[in-house]
Amino acid sequence: MDKTLSQARTRVTISEVAQAAGVSKATVSRYIGGDRQLLADATAQRIEAVIEQLGYRPNRMASALKRGRTRLIGMLLADIRNPYSVAVMHGVETACREHGYSLVVCNTDCDDARERQHLQALQAYNVDGLIVNTLGHHAGELASLAQELPMVLVDRQLAELQTDLVGLDNADAVEQALDHLHACGYRDILAVSEPLDGTSSRQERVAAFQASIARRSGLRGQVLEVSANLPGQLAAFLASAGHGPQALFSCNGVATLEVMRHLHGRGEQLFQQLGLVALDDLDWYPLVGGGITALAQPTERIAAAAVQCLLERLQGSQLPARRLDLRAQLIVRGSTPIRN
């Protein structure tokens, strides 16, 4: 085939895959439709090799036109064990159900290979749209998928994607935390974050913390990432007293749990010596001492807004991609007593 004509081709067809693999179109359809177990291993392997060689991708849009919408929404999650992810997923499922849609969830477990597998599978799924909360290490594949179906990001911005984003106003949340700690008399503040790892929400919180500390007179701020070194680093921070009353700001629920694991030995006296404000408000926060002061994320509103954005795109909205940042709510508990 002429090279120029080959390059001009925009999409390999299922007929070409069937011809190259020596099987019928129905057999290829069965393979890409998730019924691989019905095929002989040799046949499935031959089809798989041809698909990879030709770069074939199922035409999801054409399939949708033939069969109509499935009223299925896909959701790609980085870590289904993360309390934030669970809360948002529940909110998305609720909003989908209210609008007559069902939710299909794929969990990557923060694993790049698994994320790639799910993306490849989602290219063949007949979902009407996709909500994404993931590490984004395969932004190219996500961008390609976004050309085929509506997509909305939750919590994490991916520069390569021009899609709607719904999440927390991270700068405002950090400002609320530091305003509260400052007003309560804390002067030496340590922020603890999960590893940044290119995750935009974590980066925004750390950057906002550093910028806010720099603007405030009399405050000292440091940042640590959760790692195997955290116990020693926390001990070093506590031993460096001298700049004034100390406090911790944990940047999400996972970081809060890690901090508390290493500080639980202090028992009920903990918050008499050290303040703590945590971003996220988990069920166990009120149970620790006099309770942990928290910045509650409006997860139900975030989820509902993400679904609404997706539905608007499904209805044909051509508005420019937008970012919706929702405000956290400060909940004061016993972990931030006033210091003289």
UniProtKB/Swiss-Prot annotation:
Complexes and interactors: Homodimer.
DNA-binding region range list: 14-33
Lineage, highest ranks first: Bacteria, Pseudomonadati, Pseudomonadota, Gammaproteobacteria, Pseudomonadales
Protein name: HTH-type transcriptional regulator PtxS
InterPro entries: HTH_LacI, HTH_TetR, LacI/GalR-like_sensor, Lambda_DNA-bd_dom_sf, Peripla_BP_I
Alphabetical list of CDD domains matching this protein: HTH_LacI, PBP1_RegR_EndR_KdgR-like
Notes on how activity is controlled: 2-ketogluconate acts as a molecular effector and causes dissociation of PtxS from its target promoter. Glucose negatively affects the molecular binding of PtxS and 2KGA, and gluconic acid inhibits the PtxS-2KGA binding reaction.
Presence of keyword Signal: no
Keywords: DNA-binding, Repressor, Transcription, Transcription regulation
Organism of derivation: Pseudomonas plecoglossicida
Highest taxon above the source species: Bacteria
UniProt domain HTH lacI-type: residue ranges: 12-67
SMART domains the UniProt entry points to: HTH_LACI
One GO molecular-function entry: DNA-binding transcription factor activity
Function statement: Involved in the regulation of 2-ketogluconic acid metabolism via the control of the expression of the kgu operon. Binds directly to a 14-bp palindrome sequence via its conserved HTH motif.
Pfam families recorded: LacI, Peripla_BP_3
Free-text comment about domains: Contains an N-terminal helix-turn-helix DNA-binding domain and a C-terminal domain that binds the effector.
Keyword Repressor assigned: yes
